[in-house]
């Protein structure tokens, strides 16, 4: 399939986009791409590269079995939408008694792989959390309880890593350098990813991703079941969107404003975003043997 290339100007100012963080956008009037395409801004910086049907039905089914990671919870600040009362509210942790700043909105989103902290909303996952010699990262809860499913999908993760390298080699090279600074036990084997965010029928509001490698790139694939329409990945500032469906791959600059259009129908759309948690370079640095220095 031939790949088209487009250069797109900004339709909205940066100030306009910042004011609309956490708001939902419609796909009405926006150009939706449904076939292979590379899209750049006017400075030549890649916004996204989209490829159809890169995963086999069997690979999609393997990923789909991880959909349980996307539990209903309060974990995505701007992406879940910002209500009039604001992103956060205060609660008292039942386990620590501390005052916590938590989200006001819920979404079906979770994580697979590894995370850059031992705690999650006030709950400690390691009794040695205060030990300065212990790594400050952990296997995610879902990965730990579904280890065989995770291992079964490693070849798919590694294939996605390979496509990342082929599509955006410059960003891949920078992310590879960054992951070389992280303890290998917290890296998804034979990839330059530490973490996968799993979203289930999640219409995200306008946001930029945070916590990932700033010089890298986001890698999104979709595994779905049943029929649905919409759910486009929108880039409102540039007035275009991508219809990423079952087996498709979208390499994207996740630090560009983006969101999703409304999803209609009774089908299930699971999106998987592969990335590197930048904080791990400090919390879980690569262990260097003094004999190697």
Where do the language-model regions lie?
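Fe(II)/2-oxoglutarate oxygenase catalytic core
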Residues: 1-217, 242, 261-270, 276-293
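Generic beta-strand/beta-sheet core signal
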Residues: 236, 252-253, 275
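Conserved metal-binding segment of the jelly-roll/cupin
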Residues: 242-257
């Amino acid at each position: 399939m031939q790949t088209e290339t487009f250069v797109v100007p900004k339709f909205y100012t940066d100030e306009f986009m910042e004011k609309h963080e956490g708001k939902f956008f419609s796909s009405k009037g926006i150009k939706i791409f449904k076939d292979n395409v590379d899209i750049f801004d006017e400075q030549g910086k890649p916004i996204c590269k989209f490829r159809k049907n890169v995963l086999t039905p069997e690979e999609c089914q393997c990923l789909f079995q991880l959909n349980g990671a996307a539990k209903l919870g309060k974990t995505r600040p701007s992406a879940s939408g910002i209500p009039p009362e604001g992103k956060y509210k205060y609660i008292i942790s039942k386990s620590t008694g501390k005052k916590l700043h938590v989200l006001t909105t819920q979404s079906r989103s979770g994580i697979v792989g590894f995370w850059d902290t031992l705690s999650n909303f006030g709950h400690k996952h390691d009794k040695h959390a205060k030990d300065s010699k212990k790594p400050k990262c952990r296997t995610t809860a879902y990965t730990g309880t579904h280890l065989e499913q995770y291992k079964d999908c490693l070849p798919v993760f590694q294939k996605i890593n390979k496509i990342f390298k082929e599509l955006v080699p410059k960003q891949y090279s920078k992310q590879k350098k960054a992951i070389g600074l992280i303890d290998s036990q917290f890296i998804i084997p034979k990839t330059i990813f530490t973490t996968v965010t799993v979203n289930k029928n999640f219409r995200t509001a306008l946001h930029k991703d945070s916590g990932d490698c700033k010089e890298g790139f986001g890698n999104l694939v979709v595994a779905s079941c049943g029929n649905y329409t919409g759910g486009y990945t929108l880039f409102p500032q540039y007035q275009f969107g991508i219809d990423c469906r079952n087996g498709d791959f979208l390499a994207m600059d996740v630090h560009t404003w983006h969101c999703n259009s409304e999803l209609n129908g009774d089908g299930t759309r699971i999106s998987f975003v592969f990335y590197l948690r930048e904080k791990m370079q400090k919390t879980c640095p690569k262990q260097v043997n003094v004999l190697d220095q």
